[in-house]
């Protein structure tokens, strides 16, 4: 199978959904990732996805590929990227994949990957493409069996861990603009647990990003938050 070379970046895999990043391509990447995991003696990979519209379907395609290699999958559902890394530690898998478009436009999505505690980058990411192109893929059979899939809600443990580590010197009143990105699913609950009074802006998760793009490095995306603070 030929995979677009340009989607394999230095620190992640990233492409345009339906063009350079399709469910079929992601499934093949999943099988390559599962094969690499087995070579590293890893048996289970956590998967999460952000609020982009393509997230659930790409996460399921990724899971199919990983399980085809004989590796188990724990689906975390809609989560922020740090929650996948936390789950890999908390659940003892040492492996996780976040399906996320990061700061890119809505028609993009991608994969950030950790195997055996290593964040994949550079040559290791390129080796996944090489596995697919050369057919160096493990495939489950009647003897080994396909990997199993389960689901786990990591949110409560994630929030509890942060609350146990962070103590505010005094209560705070804060405004949070999530730009309709995935943090909106958890921000209020987390900050209130820390003792904050929270004013929410655009915290409904919506992959269309109807208000502004969830990229705070662009100055105009901070306009609504600045207005809220002034008021």
PLM segments and residue spans:
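An N-terminal, well-structured beta->alpha segment
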Residues: 1-64, 68-69, 151-172
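Gly/Ser/Thr-rich beta-alpha loop segments that engage phosphate groups in nucleotides
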Residues: 14-17, 50, 79, 98, ...
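N-terminal small/polar loop signature for handling phosphorylated ligands or for N-terminal nucleophile
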Residues: 39, 44-108, 189-231
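Gly/Ser/Thr-enriched, mixed-charge loops and adjacent short helices
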Residues: 109-231
